[in-house]
Amino acid sequence: MEFREQVLDLLAEVAENNIVKENPDVEIFEEGIIDSFQTVGLLLEIQNKLDIEVSIMDFDRDEWATPNKIVEALEELR
């Protein structure tokens, strides 16, 4: 499975919403698709399933505002 697809699948699972796959430019925080609890869950799932460690201190809502931006950020951290 392609890395981008893995990230979008993970994001859809955490968000419990496929909009993140259908519209990867959707503002996930502004639209209320992911809340603060889900954000922590997302970071844990990224570590567990993708073996990429992202500390909460490195997490920036502006840089991680859309699914596309999340994929880009994680590709840099791989």
From Swiss-Prot:
Location of the Carrier domain: 1-78
Superkingdom classification of source: Bacteria
Chief subcellular location: cytoplasm
Modified positions (O-(pantetheine 4'-phosphoryl)serine) in chain numbering: 36
Post-translational modification: 4'-phosphopantetheine is transferred from CoA to a specific serine of apo-DCP.
The entry's keywords: Cell wall biogenesis/degradation, Cytoplasm, Phosphopantetheine, Phosphoprotein
Pathway involvement of the protein, from the record: Cell wall biogenesis; lipoteichoic acid biosynthesis
InterPro entries in alphabetical order: ACP-like_sf (IPR036736), DltC (IPR003230), PP-bd_ACP (IPR009081)
HAMAP family: DltC
Protein name per the record: D-alanyl carrier protein
Taxonomic path: Bacteria, Bacillati, Bacillota, Bacilli, Bacillales
Gene giving rise to this polypeptide: dltC
